[in-house]
Amino acid sequence: MAGALENARKEIKRLSLDDTNESQYGQIYSVSGPVVIAENMIGCAMYELVKVGHDNLVGEVIRINGDKATIQVYEETAGVTVGDPVLRTGKPLSVELGPGLMETIYDGIQRPLKAIKDESQSIYIPRGIDVPALSRTVQYDFTPGQLKVGDHITGGDIFGSIYENSLLDDHKILLPPRARGTITSIAEAGSYNVEEPVLEVEFDGKKHKYSMMHTWPVRVPRPVAEKLTADHPLLTGQRVLDSLFPCVQGGTTCIPGAFGCGKTVISQSLSKFSNSDVIIYVGCFTKGTQVMMADGADKSIESIEVGDKVMGKDGMPREVVGLPRGYDDMYKVRQLSSTRRNAKSEGLMDFTVSADHKLILKTKQDVKIATRKIGGNTYTGVTFYVLEKTKTGIELVKAKTKVFGHHIHGQNGAEEKAATFAAGIDSKEYIDWIIEARDYVQVDEIVKTSTTQMINPVHFESGKLGNWLHEHKQNKSLAPQLGYLLGTWAGIGNVKSSAFTMNSKDDVKLATRIMNYSSKLGMTCSSTESGELNVAENEEEFFNNLGAEKDEAGDFTFDEFTDAMDELTINVHGAAASKKNNLLWNALKSLGFRAKSTDIVKSIPQHIAVDDIVVRESLIAGLVDAAGNVETKSNGSIEAVVRTSFRHVARGLVKIAHSLGIESSINIKDTHIDAAGVRQEFACIVNLTGAPLAGVLSKCALARNQTPVVKFTRDPVLFNFDLIKSAKENYYGITLAEETDHQFLLSNMALVHNCGERGNEMAEVLMEFPELFTEISGRKEPIMKRTTLVANTSNMPVAAREASIYTGITLAEYFRDQGKNVSMIADSSSRWAEALREISGRLGEMPADQGFPAYLGAKLASFYERAGKATALGSPDRVGSVSIVAAVSPAGGDFSDPVTTSTLGITQVFWGLDKKLAQRKHFPSINTSVSYSKYTNVLNKYYDSNYPEFPQLRDKIREILSNAEELEQVVQLVGKSALSDSDKITLDVATLIKEDFLQQNGYSSYDAFCPIWKTFDMMRAFISYYDEAQKAIANGAQWSKLAESTSDVKHAVSSAKFFEPSRGQKEGEKEFGDLLTTISERFAEASE
């Protein structure tokens, strides 16, 4: 009966499959960790992609038996139950191939980790999340190829290209391998995302549209036109590998070694320095934002290039090493007044940033003690700010309150405890923190009221005004005096001449200062009352006209009241009252104080903000004397107020004030009729406050404005701000060198954080990898620009690790089809084999050695056979290669491990790592006695045409090392003195080779990367030293004496590694040629 019911149930289900939607579903029959068996799966195919359970977990069919299918699930299966639906997709597990692969970090099934983090706001990958591998929002500039409408096109043909980054500037757009037809339309040059159709072809009367991306099943090798024999070395920059155990572009390499032997170091070296075009390894601002460069000039962020230097907060340059670009939500930073109600500085501090831009913030600690009633009880509470991490891993400042109940401690006790707790809070005045713009919305409003950004003072001094004086045959040291005159002119100068008009009787000392400084600069002055006179006469007669008396010190005393002082105009001329060669007028015109567009506009140019500090202070002092007044507030602080009718003068003044660390703001008064019916003209009122203002006022001429010089520090000026989300735009960022503080100044002196840094969603290794750099054509570039990382996070199930190796090799084949030389680094294939073992165990398959499946060797071979050099499908002709470098981590460094032995049977190069060498800090820790390469003969053609002696030198070095190993065993028995001189030379030269040739310092500029030409020249030097020594011994010399007399030669050979490759091959060949000559000559002299 039970059997009949079961058959009936199956029949009912079978009949219901007539519904097309229902036919897509099966049901879970059993669950065992990542292995799920589903029933009612008739029609599914091997390696078909399925969605398991109500969470749509990604899985892949790996076995079919009747209507049951065994599925390996790539996500955690907790909570999945029998009877849950299984959705068939009808497609194999595939990856997306197209623009956007570079600089991206994926998990084992090509899910972008950063995009998942942004969507889920979690450092973990939520179950069932579905994020496209390639961004659908980023726009790429598509350039069509030579194909046009009507041309026939077939799989692999290139029909366009895009600029991805500065290292991959010709990402070719390919037609998928299985597509073909006649072109009916092709997109014009322009910006498109990866989904928009850019090509339409017709075949057999059917039209198909293609975008810049396509998909490809990971377990199927991409087809090629022809497999070629690899004949070019894969240069790693490591001497021991490039000389003794070379690999080819398109070869297979195995790196077995125990933990701590340096497998990852070699992997990073490959990524940084290898001659591959692409490596597959398993914040920013809106356009137009002005950045302050290291020389004080402003430059649009989109115009900045790698290698440029921007201004750091300490006035020192910061080198640009990367240029992140993208398309994202943007946020406008808008300055507010201290009350946070309205814009404060006329948009001077406004700028726009991308969502992942890091804001550098300061929150003023505000500890308050108050008594309050909560739920009928009285408490004494302490309110304060604290920096803490949220559940999603974001660090932000929060307002906290700690309460002490009166009903528990009594009133006095609660108040005492509150006071003690308040005293124990961190006493720093400000909390410094950094947060991404997109996360600022999570900050509480109460915290925002106390949170500010920083306007950093400019410590750099360009000396531009002094240099300008020098060019005009004046003393550089007079730059502050000229600065004062320029500031005074900006306040009360005539817009059409170098004349100053003073309206107050109090401005006599200002007039004196103008005449005095003009005299020092070789100019003369005249006034409206006294005609053109030289400076000394002018000053004397000027005061005589006032009825002044002169004392012995040369100072004047006169009656305060005089009608003559209602208005005084001083004209400044060139030497001898000439209208030509007027230094002040030339300065006003050429330095930008008079706007070029019209004669009636004054301005203070931007470059003054980076001039010498004394020049900046003198210029503001002149402006305060001319058009300002100084007030002492009730709290004892001093404020200077400057009034001007020129907007550009006000903006320039604020910028210079900010550059000195002086707080400033602009209050705009539009033209209006006041309460008394008087017309008031347009005016900009600039308020200046802060301790550094004392440096300015000490340079004023008028007594009412002067203050004594006091000690002060130039701290950043804080400004309140609001963050407003705006539309998506293209963003432009810059990445600064790793050793810097990652902070630089915008043109408005806002202190900002560089872009391109990775978040905390990766493991430590993945944090380090994006921060590595390589040098390309003299430019320092992040290696992520030519790298795609396929990473398996620690919390990903075992099945995803099994798939990751196929994901990586498929991405590598895609770039090979573009004509690139690709290195795929599998680190480590042992983890992949362990994943294979676990799944095999759950499937109940017969285990082989150490529990690994019997088909381990076949699986490894099917992976490695996808390496090689090949002619790609399609036109134009392209030759590319995929090199596989697999790190293996055998337990305890045992090379008889099944994974190691299976890998060695397939790969052609074996770089064996030695734990003892690693413990001695000998890196790369390659054991030369067990390592080998089967590519040496294949590469002879390359060596013959480039370095003819290379094979002989390599064989000689290996022979010396091999003989020395045998001799070391003899020395342990009989001692070194029992050896012949010839054998002693072999031992000494072998030691020299090990310490100065095989060993490399990865942290030095001279040795981190060794080009093949330097490796070759060093090999010649070492072998020449060996040959000359053996020749001298054969002629009767004693090695002990000879070694002593030629110790300088040995030192020179040992120091050959210190030659900087950046000096170039020609210089290197000359230096090594001189070394070879020296070796021959010194041994010849010593032998005589």
Swiss-Prot record:
It holds the Pfam family ATP-synt_VA_C. This protein undergoes a protein self splicing that involves a post-translational excision of the VDE intervening region (intein) followed by peptide ligation. InterPro entries: ATP-synt_VA_C, ATP-synth_a_Xtn, ATP_synth_asu-like_sf, ATPase_a/bsu_AS, ATPase_F1/V1/A1_a/bsu_N, ATPase_F1/V1/A1_a/bsu_N_sf, ATPase_F1/V1/A1_a/bsu_nucl-bd, ATPase_F1/V1_b/a_C. ATP binds at G257, A258, F259, G260, C261, G262, K263, T264. One of its GO terms (cellular component) is fungal-type vacuole membrane. Its EC number is 7.1.2.2, 3.1.-.-. This is V-type proton ATPase catalytic subunit A. The gene is VMA1.
